[in-house]
Each structure stands twice: as structure tokens, then as C-alpha cells.
UniProtKB/Swiss-Prot annotation:
Residues reported to bind substrate: R12, Y24, T25, R69, E99, W100, E101, Y102, R181, H244
Signal peptide residues on this chain, from the entry's feature table: none
Protein function: Sedoheptulose 1,7-bisphosphatase involved in riboneogenesis. Dephosphorylates sedoheptulose 1,7-bisphosphate (SBP), which is converted via the non-oxidative pentose phosphate pathway to ribose-5-phosphate. Has a fructose 1,6-bisphosphatase activity in vitro, but this is probably not biologically relevant, since deletion does not affect fructose 1,6-biphosphate (FBP) levels.
Protein name: Sedoheptulose 1,7-bisphosphatase
Subunit: Homodimer.
Mutagenesis / variant outcome for changing W131A: Leads to reduced substrate affinity
Active site positions: H13, E99
Species name: Saccharomyces cerevisiae (strain ATCC 204508 / S288c)
Localization: Cytoplasm; Nucleus
Cellular component annotations (GO), alphabetically ordered: cytoplasm; nucleus
Superkingdom in the source lineage: Eukaryota
Effect of H176A: Impairs catalytic activity
Induction pattern: Expression is correlated with levels of ribosomal proteins, thus periodic SHB17 expression coincides with the peak demand for ribose phosphate that occurs during ribosome synthesis.
Amino acid sequence: MPSLTPRCIIVRHGQTEWSKSGQYTGLTDLPLTPYGEGQMLRTGESVFRNNQFLNPDNITYIFTSPRLRARQTVDLVLKPLSDEQRAKIRVVVDDDLREWEYGDYEGMLTREIIELRKSRGLDKERPWNIWRDGCENGETTQQIGLRLSRAIARIQNLHRKHQSEGRASDIMVFAHGHALRYFAAIWFGLGVQKKCETIEEIQNVKSYDDDTVPYVKLESYRHLVDNPCFLLDAGGIGVLSYAHHNIDEPALELAGPFVSPPEEESQHGDV
């Protein structure tokens, strides 16, 4: 009997020219490199066939960033699936999962950003920290925290529904380096909680086009104030779930995607 504890499987897109060089890639719509394509084909083979970490029958939704590099990664990872298996999985393009909007820092390296900010008279008292300071003419940490909190609320709402129906539910999220590390951090409560009060925070934003995904209105959201100190290289996979089978106890699965089969009695994360 499979575990009924839902999981959120986060997947960073494969290698691009800018992920290889370390340039900040937000709205720039780069494709995967040939290496990145092969990388994600191998990942799909590993998680679906060799490792058997993912059962296609348990995948209820895939949410993806609209950027080409993320959508290419979805297609490549799903290659091992049959047409019938693939047809049963709903793929939802969700603009809330786009990468951090870097503004003036798009295409730059970290050292170049630090020099630019220094030339503008910034960071005299403490060094730049994107998780706290955001990006000039791009997104603040509050703005990205708000939209990722919306995405998390929708996924956790779906998990709650599927669990109540007795269905196994793996939901996959394909996105980007900064966005997914931020997503993982606030999934289980890092950062600070802020009540939705401003027009931007309380407005109804539907960032996807799929009527099977219920809209969830936020009363509050979370945003970071420091680096969560997570690593997720291009092509990397992480696992988020819930402690004690309880949707109200979101947790990080430290073992990641390569785990021993759970004991039949404990099922998943029960102690």
C-alpha cells in the first residue's frame, strides 16, 4: 500500500548558458543547453525507472514556470512515461512560479552586482543580501514571497483535498534556482509572516489557467529576511511533504528523492 502522505517534488530546470556561467537569469527566456537536455533525460530515467522514486499514477499535477527552460525540463523528465501515463497528468503553467525578477541585475554575475551597488552608494553598512534586499527595479523579497505563498497555498489545498479522498498525491513543481529555494524555505515556515493589507497583497491574482485548481485567498503570507542556506543546482530535485501525515505540518524531506522504501506500518514520516 503506497503512502498517502502527499509530497511536493521540486525540480530546477536543466543547465542553460547562463546557469553555467553564473549569470542571473530572470525574465530572459533561454533554452537548455545540449548538456542540460541530456541531464534532464537522465533525471527522468532515474526517478521513474531506475530509482522508482516516482510512480506516474500518483502524480496528480505538475505546476511549471512559464519560462522555456522550465517547460523544456518538464517534457524531458516525462519522456520515460507512456502516452497513456502522460495524458493522465495535468500540467499547469503558473506565472507565480517564475524566477525572481532581477531588474537591473539581469544577466550579471554576483561580483558585478556588488560592484554596481557600490558605485550607487549602496550597502555601506552591510553587504547586499538578495533574500533581504531584493533587486533594484526588480522584485523585493516581499513581492516574491507573496506570489510563492500563493502557489504554496494552492498546492497544499490540493493535497488536503486528495488526502481526504484517500488518494496518493505527488505534485511536481518545475521552476528556478532562487524561486525554488525560496519556495522550500517558506513551505515549512522559515522567514516572517505578514498580514495581507496593501492593494498588491489583497488583490485577487490568478496566475494560471486551469479551472480544476481552486483559487485560494491569502489572509497572510511569508517572506524571507535572510539566506535560507539551501543549495539546488541546475537539474536538482528536492522533496517537500508533511510530518505525521498532517497537512498542517509542512516539512522538508531531508532524504530527498533517493530513499529506502518506507516501512509498511509507518508509511511515511510518522515519527
